[in-house]
Amino acid sequence: MTKHELIVWRYIREKQLGVKFKRQVPINRYIVDFFSLEIGLVIEIDGGHHYDPKITKKDKVRTNDLLNWGLTVIRYNNDEVLTNIEGVINSIGEKVDELKERYEIE
């Protein structure tokens, strides 16, 4: 787990946002950074190498596959985590609330 993933993990572990997240979860042929099975939410934290055009293309394929499997995917980059962790966590919390409402989870 990267330093940036650990920062996010501190805020989402132990149902702090109302759902359980697991880290480094295998989904088919991918390993995602964080996943909540309850609401089908994948969270990815992208490092600097994700700006490489080849990696960006692979990320798009990966995201499309996850979406096609019925999951919701949100991505943040390392800079966002370091400079705006409050905004990142608020954004995740809003998505969690939206999906809990969609799936009628209290």
Q: Could you say what each language-model-derived stretch is?
A:
Residues 1-106:
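Nucleic-acid endo/exonuclease domains
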